[in-house]
């Protein structure tokens, strides 16, 4: 259960260089040979591989890769302001398309397909159906790293 998982992390932490708050930290630690394993983000690893860091290898947990969902919203009552419309249009249009084209080529558009060299073609994603805000807050109350 959850307590056993936390006990596991207590033992594992003896061999952890650091728990980073940045997504690039684990990848940079690998490149600088400060770590043998880094839990990082796929697009950052792919970017470094494409820049010539060919010793990096992308592996996923047997249970699947964790994932994040992103979205944009506008505060109610602000949606008619010209500047808000302009920024929102950029975020949900051009920026999302450029990000998908350059870093995260997974299929999100019906009519567009992007290809990023060395980006894994088939990523198995983990079942994160119980990953709620309440579950995260409860976990963070016990997390000491």
List the model feature ranges, each with a label.
Residues 90-113:
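Periplasmic-binding protein-like
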Residues 54-66, 75-78:
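Short beta-strand->loop
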Residues 1-59:
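Ligand-binding pocket segment of bilobal, Venus flytrap-like solute-binding proteins
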Residues 1-4, 77-84:
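Short helix-loop capping/hinge motifs at secondary-structure junctions, enriched
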Residues 114-145:
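Extracellular/periplasmic bilobal clamshell ligand-binding domains
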Residues 7-10, 28, 32, 82-85, ...:
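Solvent-exposed, polar/charged alpha-helical surfaces in well-ordered, non-transmembrane soluble domains
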Residues 55, 69, 85-87:
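Active-site lining segments that contact anionic ligands and/or coordinate catalytic metals
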Residues 68-80, 99-102:
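A bilobed periplasmic-binding-protein/Venus flytrap-type ligand-binding module shared by bacterial periplasmic
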């Amino acid at each position: 259960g959850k307590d056993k998982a936390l006990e596991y992390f207590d033992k594992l932490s003896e061999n952890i260089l650091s728990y980073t708050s940045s997504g690039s930290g684990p990848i940079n630690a690998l490149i600088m040979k400060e770590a043998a394993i880094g839990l990082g983000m796929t697009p950052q690893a792919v970017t470094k591989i494409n820049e010539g860091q060919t010793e990096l290898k992308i592996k996923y947990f047997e249970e699947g890769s964790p994932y994040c969902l992103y979205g944009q919203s506008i505060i109610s009552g602000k949606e008619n302001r010209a500047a808000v419309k302009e920024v929102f249009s950029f975020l949900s249009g051009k920026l999302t398309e450029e990000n998908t084209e350059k870093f995260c080529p997974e299929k999100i558009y019906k009519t567009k397909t992007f290809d990023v060299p060395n980006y894994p073609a088939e990523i198995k994603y983990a079942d994160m159906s119980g990953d709620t805000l309440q579950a995260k807050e409860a976990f963070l109350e016990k997390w000491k790293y």
